[in-house]
Amino acid sequence: MSRIIVKGLPVYLTDDNLREHFTKRLRQKHSHQAVNGSGPDLITDVKILRDRNGESRRFGFIGYRNEEDAFDAVEYFNGSFINTSKIEVSMAKSFADPRVPQPMKEKRREALKRFREKEEKLLQEENRKKKKVDENKHSNIDDEIRKNKQLQEFMETMKPSSQVTSWEKVGIDKSIEDEKLKREEEDSSVQGNSLLAHALALKEENNKDEAPNLVIENESDDEYSALNRNRDEDQEDAGEEEKMISISNLKDTDIGLVNDDANSDEKENEKRRNLAQDEKVSDLDWFKQRRVRIKESEAETREKSSSYATEQNESLDTKKEEQPERAVPQKTDEELAIEKINQTGRLFLRNILYTSKEEDFRKLFSPFGELEEVHVALDTRTGQSKGFAYVLFKDSKNAVNAYVELDKQIFQGRLLHILPGEEKKSHRLDEFDLKNMPLKKQKELKRKAAASRQTFSWNSLYMNQDAVLGSVAAKLGLEKSQLIDAENSSSAVKQALAEAHVIGDVRKYFESKGVDLTKFSQLKSTNQRDDKVILVKNFPFGTTREELGEMFLPYGKLERLLMPPAGTIAIVQFRDTTSARAAFTKLSYKRFKDGIIYLERGPKDCFTKPAEADDLINNTSAKEEENPVEVKPSSNDLMEANKDVTEGSSNAHDEDVIDGPTVSIFIKNLNFSTTNQNLTDRFKVFTGFVVAQVKTKPDPKHQGKTLSMGFGFVEFRTKEQANAVIAAMDGTVIDGHKIQLKLSHRQASQSGNTKTKSNKKSGKIIVKNLPFEATRKDVFELFNSFGQLKSVRVPKKFDKSARGFAFVEFLLPKEAENAMDQLHGVHLLGRRLVMQYAEEDAVDAEEEIARMTKKVRKQVATNEMAALRNGGGRKKLDVDDEENEGF
């Protein structure tokens, strides 16, 4: 937490006045820093809260870059006065803190949300009840439709042809025809029955007086009959009475009348059938003959059923359309944000400090998971931050966790606002597009795409062999054909010596420009590389500094461009990382002249001093060219020149050697944020300073990182110098902590400085990665130019072929060290030589026997362990202390 809240401010106080008041303490605390205004830079945000009218609410917030300054401000200013107002200072809380009271606006918003949810539930319950009533109503209507056969027939007929198959249509037509025939028969029978009932009624009226004792079978015993009966019911009763009357009681005339009516109906049907078969009859006449009168009650029933069927279909369609909308629940903004982050794995950061670096956000977000990219948006014209950044995780789940934990949290004194970021645009070709290209083009594009993730950790100062020979030939005034003789067996050695000479010149030039070459050998991971520094390699000899500048300038402003006079390698530093990344991506493996450019990111903090005026590419200084030598020397002059360089470097080296043990000073109560560089800057001004080191330990939470242990050591040449430093620096303040100094009992330097241990090194070195084609003569000629050799041995196999390494022993250890320094990074027959110090030969026979015994025990133990692993079973193996040392 690096943000504080200040209460009880005067009404008239402004933001600038509040900043100035709290800056005084920072200037007093960081008084040892020489840069004026470093205190104000540590305050990142000042804000006094005001109401709608612009009146001060008498409290405000102040943000600090680090937590130590924020806690110090709370302790120093709490209970103090600004003019006549007593202020109260405490640590501010973030929005995610549960102790923060909920504002009234948020309470009203939540109450409204609960009211809407309750209203929605009531509406859903009402719709459910209404739907249930409609379903019951529809089920009753369906039952009525199933009972009415004529309505079913009508609905089947009115179905569209797309819903009825051909065989179903034939069956329906046949059933319709059968139904029509059946209906005609029923109509004819009903008509005959009505005539019969009419005749019987006449007969009954005529025979009331004549036959009073007429017996009617199965007569009803009801004493009363309904008065208001319908006409249809009378016909039904008449039909029932017709069945009850005995046929034997009818007269012959009546029976004949009935038979005549039946015959007439049959004739009418026969006439209709003949009319249908007559070809001369028109379709209209036939249709008129087939018409059947429908009662008004039946017509109304059919209309209602058809209208209901149409409404039912429309309601079903409407339900299908409305159902998906009701099924999808409304998601909150938080859920939508998490869903988008799960898809992209990218976060958008707002309200960040304008001076924040990418390393700050890497430290903040790396605990949540592995980061793929951190990008701070910069203005290409000014190089300043725009106030927002992007963080891309390899796993989207880690991005969600970071969003939940860090959103609206305090970072560098500001409230960090995190939003889901859009997916990063990629212009990469897919596999389908690559397949349509030539194979050579495919390999080129794939290599270019992998350039940003590829690192060259094997040789940072790699140089093109052709450019090396061209540089040496131009320096000696020779042609490359004259420098290297194809028929000479020592051509490979001459080429290696030429490369060593060029590498020596390049190192001298870079060291004069403030480049720390030791950083290049310490590169072990991508985290130790600086995106703004690019090493340019493999360009042909003759390339000028202006040509390289024209290549890199379109991508952004250059801070410096260093190119040695040899013209075989260059270092480019951009002002911002965005421009450097764009240049690295676009120019990797680009064809330039008759070669392909290799790019590599340089190490962090490789420059020990700021850029000079002549390092800027904007200064179009004249090209520095050396005059060629009029007399062409022989190729042996190269060895002589190399010897001169070796002697000069050895003399300079002798001046840096420290004779005798150094004296260490133990420093206690260091700030955990104090680094080796900070400690070095404070003590390097004293005479006799050697090295300063802060003791660290591995960070258990973050793999590959270290934590300060709160103490350190500073080494000086003599004890008198160390005592003088203790008297001057004991009790002073470094990074806000009062340090304590005293002499340490550790006398020998353990800083890893190779120069202080040069006397303990042997004159025997082992040369690894030696080409199998190299002979003992090649190794002898290569190392003979750096000193007097005592022995050269190239071990071989049983078939007389080389084993890939050699032993070279110099007469003096100093000569061996010079040879290792000069041949560092040199190639022999295309292989980079790797050199290390070898163990010296045993002084007496007993020591040699002990070494051989230890070696044999190690081999035996290794073989037994291998047999145990491959045997599949567990065996008991006794290993004593001496054997354990060999593992």
UniProtKB/Swiss-Prot annotation:
- Give any extra note attached to this record: Present with 2220 molecules/cell in log phase SD medium.
- Quaternary assembly: Interacts with NOP1. Binds to the 35S pre-rRNA and the U3 snoRNA.
Cite the PROSITE patterns for this sequence.
RRM (PS50102)
Q: What is this protein called?
A: Multiple RNA-binding domain-containing protein 1
Query: Which family would the database say this protein is a member of?
Result: Belongs to the RRM MRD1 family.
Q: Which PANTHER family match?
A: RNA-BINDING MOTIF PROTEIN 14B (PTHR48039), RNA-BINDING PROTEIN 28 (PTHR48039:SF5)
One GO biological-process annotation of the entry reads: poly(A)+ mRNA export from nucleus
Q: So which domain of life are we looking at?
A: Eukaryota
Q: Where is the composition biased (Polar residues)?
A: 306-315
Q: Which GO terms describe its molecular function?
A: mRNA binding; rRNA primary transcript binding
Q: Which UniProt keywords apply?
A: Nucleus, Phosphoprotein, Repeat, Ribonucleoprotein, RNA-binding, rRNA processing
- Point out residues bearing the modification Phosphoserine: 220, 264
Which segments constitute the RRM domain?
2-94, 345-423, 532-604, 663-746, 763-840
Where found?
Nucleus
Residue ranges of region Disordered?
A: 121-143, 203-276, 297-336, 864-887
Q: Name one GO cellular component term.
A: nucleolus
Record has RNA-binding as a keyword: yes
Which Gene3D superfamilies did the record assign?
3.30.70.330
UniProt feature, compositional bias: Basic and acidic residues:
264-276, 316-325
Q: What does this protein do?
A: Involved in pre-rRNA processing. Required for maintaining steady-state levels of 40S ribosomal subunit. Required for the initial processing of pre-rRNA at the A0 to A2 sites, leading to the processing of the 23S pre-rRNA intermediate to the 18S rRNA.
Q: What is the lineage of its organism?
A: Eukaryota, Fungi, Dikarya, Ascomycota, Saccharomycotina
- Predominantly, its location class is nucleus
- InterPro entries annotated for this entry? Mrd1_RRM3 (IPR034482), Nucleotide-bd_a/b_plait_sf (IPR012677), RBD_domain_sf (IPR035979), RRM_dom (IPR000504), RRM_MRD1_RNA_proc_ribogen (IPR051945)
